[in-house]
């Protein structure tokens, strides 16, 4: 009886997962045009300017490209007790998901100390928690992460490169 219930659960879980809205579409990689990349980076810098970072002075901005073309900005928001601090990437994802959007193609991320001029400093890769949030909603084979210093100086990675052997929803089935 237990084995039969487990089998039924597995069949149902596989059906639900394979029929999730946009699941099959996530397998298709979208080629990002240069102007789209530059716009994402520009919007990430706009978001970075809104960061609330009174403690670290390290401002991060993100611009998340949804499957339909809409862009969601996010900035990091610090808190005096540190634990409730939220990263820019998660802010962008949570804004989109709270509006019912769960399919994404790319994200641009910029970050640096507030006093460092644009184009100087270093690239700002996402933290482990943000990579895991990306893995929840994005196909690691196709989702593109743009790490930028400026609109013309950037690197593009696939999620699978920044989160190899990532744990995702299909691992719970």
Language-model features: locations:
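C-terminal binding/interaction regions
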Residues: 28-32, 36-47, 104-173
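Short beta-strand scaffold segments in enzyme catalytic cores
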Residues: 59-65
